[in-house]
Amino acid sequence: MRHETDPVARQALILATDPFRSGQRTADDASDVTGYLQQLAASSPHQSDRSAARTVLRGWGVELKAPSRDVSEVPQRLAQRNWWVNEQGITMVILELPVYASGPQALVAGREEEASAGPKSRTHLFAISSTEVSREQLLRCQQSFPFLLEGPEDHTWPANNVFSVVAMQYCRWLSERSAEGFDEVDMCYPERNRITTDHLQLSDEQLRKTSYRLPTEAEWEYACSSGTATPWSHGSSDVELLEFCCCAGNSRGKLFPVGSLYPNAWGIYDMHGNVAEWCHPAPSATGNYALRGGNYTVPTSRTKSRSLNYPGSKGYSFTGFRIARTILRTDSGELK
């Protein structure tokens, strides 16, 4: 795996070592591989192989060093790698979405017909969190919350029973406290007490703002597929899916800690299953809103990157969210 130059291919090789626990290898081999994976986990510029290294090391019981949360030089760092860790400990992964149409629906709807409309005219740079927002992270914003299902005391399960307004309020709270330098003009949403389900409708102007927000359906679908055209991001096998997805086939009626299964090729976890995630669509005629990715209660066939419509004003045991933000490139080529 050391000689592989493609980070996605290197990720696959790393994950293939996971079943071979240290007891099944010689002490020298175990030490050598562990040291290499620790190096990738700490400093790889690619979230693909970094995520695989962290996943395998956790499975081997190796304590991982917490990554730096100093975001004061994020733009400079982004020129060297495709991820950073914000103050809340959330890893953000930078992706570049091809855009095949003009107008806000090109970045909101995530419709397959837009992908077949012709050659791409531009790209949209954005970042999406590698994991769903955990209960611990949401509780930093809200002193208490009526989560459903009794989970572990460390609150590592994804936040659930979340409705869309709570998710947007968290994004606004995070943006207000971020050292990434957001001013009011950068905010996608108004003050927290003014956010309603109406703010799930995004304009082009709002999408150009760089504060934290929910992903659009197009962004979510692109991050989920991770460059594949198969039913699930890992391929077509519903048996192998259980290594990547918390669903009825393995959940036993419970959620999994965020990021505890295998990541997709771009280093993003739990895009299939665990909790369904609120996204920014245009609302349907019924006033319902988009949830993506299936959840812990459904069979594998319902964990694909499909869109489900539910009332945005209600939460369920299977509804949660992850965060995103637009990335801009300055005239000098710097990202911000």
Q: What kind of region is each of these model predictions?
A:
Residues L15-P19, R58:
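Structural signature of alpha-helical solenoid repeat scaffolds
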Residues T5-R10, P45-R50:
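Positions within the helices of HEAT/ARM-like alpha-solenoid repeats
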Residues G59-V85, G89, R325-D331, L335:
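Pro/Ala/Gly-rich low-complexity, hydrophilic intrinsically disordered segments
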Residues E153-T156, S164-L308, G312, S317:
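Functional-site microenvironments in short loops/helix caps that host divalent-cation chemistry
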Residues M1, G23-L40, E63-S72:
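Amphipathic alpha-helical scaffolding segments comprising HEAT/armadillo-like alpha-solenoid repeats
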Residues N82-E150, H155-S175, H272-G273, G320, ...:
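A short glycine-rich, aromatic-capped structural motif
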Residues G23-A27, A66-R69, Q105-A106, R140-Q143, ...:
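Short, solvent-exposed loop/turn and secondary-structure capping segments
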